[in-house]
Amino acid sequence: MPQFLSEDFLLDTEFARRLYHEYAVDQPIFDYHCHLPPEQIAENYRFKNLYDIWLKGDHYKWRAMRTNGVPERLCTGDASDWEKFEAWAATVPHTIGNPLYHWTHLELRRPFGVTGTLLSPSTAKGIWDRCNAMLERDDFTARGIMQQMNVKMVGTTDDPIDDLRHHKAVAQDSSFSIKVLPSWRPDKAFNIELATFNDYMAKLGEVSDTDIRRFSDLQTALTKRLDHFAAHGCKVSDHALDVVMFAEADDATLDKILARRLAGETLSEHEVAQFKTGVLVWLGAEYARRGWVQQYHIGALRNNNLRQFKLLGPDVGFDSINDRPLAQELSRLLSKQNEENLLPKTILYCLNPRDNEVLGTMIGNFQGEGMPGKMQFGSGWWFNDQKDGMQRQMTQLAQLGLLSRFVGMLTDSRSFLSYTRHEYFRRILCQMIGRWVEDGEAPADLPLLGEMVKNISFDNAKNYFAIEL
């Protein structure tokens, strides 16, 4: 019987073990999409305790705790840090079968070195004290953990109005070699249907010194901010497309739509689609001219619990998978961007695994001549960021495209302890390829498949994003 979380965790064939230990394990981490707070990296934040680094802001854990009957006070409320950690420790034994159980113990093992001990009510105090003592050390600050985990690059998620002063501070610090680059997340600039849109237009106009009245004014304001981001090393954009829309409109129509919204009027769904299409097509061309990568995260159904949204706000664990069709609108959006050969490198993620084959085939329609893997089907996202979800995504990518050109894993996380998700991903990748070899579906060619694993673990992403390390 295999031991839980051994050095050969998930590596159930000899070939998988060789792939992982000889090719994957020592590869650096290129974390091209995350939600780490850049100010904590800039100031080399020292975490107060295990709650501060591990549970604070983690909606995955809160969701599991609520399911386990834990009161909200112990999730997001006013309980002490220890009380919240104790409640999490009492929940962990009930998470077997959930990726949280694997993540929890991988994160305790690295970087804290906790092995052979499972988190539970009986072990909580010992783990709390041990890890808190380690967090007082210099190698367990925000930067220290990144260095321990062999991180080479992180891409944070940033709004166009952000001043990026923290990224600038990190870039100017010659004692810290890890690249910390902004990613452009302009959702607030095109989600015209939201009540917050007009206030955001005022803020965008202020930071860009632009009076936004016409669609061309919005383009001017965004261009100035794109230039600002580019000056700070940005090469990546990210868009939350909860619903994919497409409806064309000329500039005069877009001017009218924007003017009506700024006047406080409510728009039709068709007008919303026209405006979003106009912004996304224009932005895509800007990305292409600048050599940026665009990411589309598709299919989240957000803020389902209105009572809790009013109490706690967004991004606290009340989101789920949407089932709106996306194929036709996405095809038209990408095709429109491609008309003038201004479709940038693009990564598509779907939250509904039903859409895996849709994206797996969609990327094949728009691959670029002379550019390996220009269009990417992104790694299993959010609810698919688990063993079965990763296997499904990679299997379908292999069957419908080229797994060998895949840019691999990203944490998409707010926690400095989430880098072990790259280890988890690499183990699953090696397990999958090892089984192909075991079943005679792939040759037992270690150099060939080892190079493929190495590329997916690091090199493909480094080359794709073209960021000098």
Curated annotation (Swiss-Prot):
It comes from the Bacteria. Pfam families: UxaC. Its EC number is 5.3.1.12. Disulfide bonds: none annotated. The keyword Ligase does not apply. GO terms for molecular function: glucuronate isomerase activity. It catalyses: D-glucuronate = D-fructuronate; aldehydo-D-galacturonate = keto-D-tagaturonate. Pathway: Carbohydrate metabolism; pentose and glucuronate interconversion. GO terms for biological process: D-galacturonate catabolic process; D-glucuronate catabolic process. It is an enzyme of class 5 (isomerase). Keywords: Isomerase. HAMAP family: UxaC. Belongs to the metallo-dependent hydrolases superfamily. Uronate isomerase family. This is Uronate isomerase. It comes from Pectobacterium atrosepticum (strain SCRI 1043 / ATCC BAA-672).
